[in-house]
């Protein structure tokens, strides 16, 4: 996959994420970089992450098992994170704040909540697609970014975000609407970069090292493009992640109102570590991986004009990890 001088970088990029913090965890470098170079960058969040666990003792009563007020609290965290990433118009939510609820993990009772984003109601599914269609028609992004068919790590809300995104775009394309984007990208974590960063690292007190299967990783050979963050982008991602203090513990020495305990650990190659509530150590990498999930008018016999690759901070892979049919649909894709 190569860059083409005849096409410009996209002017409008929309990220579709399941919960507050996903925009920073999975795509923080790309959000920061696209904002930095002047692209109209928007983040659409589908739920408030009400079923999340909470780091630290102070705000434990916000969880769904207690007062169930965590979702509203996380709106504030998302607002701060977006500011760090250069997205200044504030949070946007599919259908409005709290229209759809965090479904929790698969096979849990929470997925049967009447507002669960990944619930099995056909009426809810249709409404979600229509709500995303309204956003696409209004904002007309050239590039959409979300997750792959497995949602990255199997969370039902991530899988639903993928399915709703692809279905909305399919309907726009089938109707011949100009609002159809040019391409959809799936955010993934490069396995080689992850393992290289974690080699020889000292695990912070109370945290643990990732075991096989703990972190969803994709081998570089299956990745189409890499976002190389500048020091500014990496710092923005780290600050955005730290803003989600109920969900993420960043080992940069910072103490917060949410979590007064500090950790200060970097990898031998200089990356800060972070952990979710499971306390599995992970590096904040200066690179993000992206798979090309769909491209408009794909032709498998020619090099395609791929908008995202015209950003200077995006490095294409040596080959194309996904093969696309003439209808632009990834072979093997069901969503």
Swiss-Prot record:
Its cofactor is Zn(2+). Keywords: Hydrolase, Metal-binding, Zinc. GO terms for molecular function: N-acetylglucosaminylinositol deacetylase activity; zinc ion binding. Gene3D superfamilies: LmbE-like. GO terms for biological process: mycothiol biosynthetic process. Binds 1 zinc ion per subunit. Zn(2+) binds at residues 19, 22, 158. InterPro entries: GlcNAc_PI_deacetylase-related (IPR003737), LmbE-like_dom_sf (IPR024078), Mycothiol_biosynthesis_MshB (IPR017810). Its EC number is 3.5.1.103. SUPFAM superfamilies: LmbE-like. NCBIfam families: mycothiol_MshB (TIGR03445). Belongs to the MshB deacetylase family. Catalyzes the deacetylation of 1D-myo-inositol 2-acetamido-2-deoxy-alpha-D-glucopyranoside (GlcNAc-Ins) in the mycothiol biosynthesis pathway. PANTHER family: 1D-MYO-INOSITOL 2-ACETAMIDO-2-DEOXY-ALPHA-D-GLUCOPYRANOSIDE DEACETYLASE, N-ACETYLGLUCOSAMINYL-PHOSPHATIDYLINOSITOL DE-N-ACETYLASE-RELATED. This is 1D-myo-inositol 2-acetamido-2-deoxy-alpha-D-glucopyranoside deacetylase. It comes from Corynebacterium urealyticum (strain ATCC 43042 / DSM 7109). The lineage of its organism: Bacteria, Bacillati, Actinomycetota, Actinomycetes, Mycobacteriales. The gene is mshB.
């Amino acid at each position: 996959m190569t860059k083409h001088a005849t096409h410009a970088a996209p002017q409008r990029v929309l990220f579709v994420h399941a919960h507050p913090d996903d925009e920073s965890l999975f795509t923080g470098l790309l959000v920061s970089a696209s904002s930095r170079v002047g692209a109209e960058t928007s983040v659409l969040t589908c739920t408030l992450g009400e079923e999340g666990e909470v780091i630290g003792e102070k705000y434990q009563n916000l969880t769904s098992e207690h007062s169930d007020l965590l979702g509203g609290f996380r709106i504030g965290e998302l607002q701060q994170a977006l500011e760090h990433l250069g997205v200044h118009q504030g949070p946007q939510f599919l259908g409005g704040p709290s229209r759809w609820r965090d479904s929790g993990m698969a096979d849990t009772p929470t997925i049967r909540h009447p507002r669960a984003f990944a619930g099995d109601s056909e009426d809810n599914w249709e409404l979600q697609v229509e709500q995303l269609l309204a956003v696409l028609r209004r904002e007309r992004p050239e590039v959409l970014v979300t997750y792959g068919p497995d949602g990255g790590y199997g969370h039902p809300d991530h899988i639903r975000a993928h399915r709703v995104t692809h279905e909305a775009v399919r309907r726009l394309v089938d109707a011949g609407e100009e609002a159809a984007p040019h391409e959809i990208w799936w955010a993934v974590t490069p396995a080689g970069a992850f393992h290289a960063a974690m080699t020889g690292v000292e695990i912070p007190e109370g945290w643990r090292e990732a075991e096989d299967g703990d972190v969803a990783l994709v081998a570089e050979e299956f990745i189409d493009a890499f976002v190389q963050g500048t020091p500014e982008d990496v710092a923005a991602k780290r600050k955005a992640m730290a803003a989600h203090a109920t969900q993420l513990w960043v080992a940069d020495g910072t103490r917060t109102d949410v979590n007064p305990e500090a950790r200060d650990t970097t990898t031998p190659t200089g990356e800060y570590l972070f952990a979710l509530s499971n306390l599995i150590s992970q590096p904040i990498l200066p690179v993000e991986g992206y798979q090309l999930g769909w491209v408009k008018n794909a032709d498998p016999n020619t090099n395609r004009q791929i908008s995202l690759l015209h950003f200077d901070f995006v490095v294409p892979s040596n080959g194309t990890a996904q093969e696309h049919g003439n209808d632009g649909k990834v072979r093997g894709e069901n969503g």
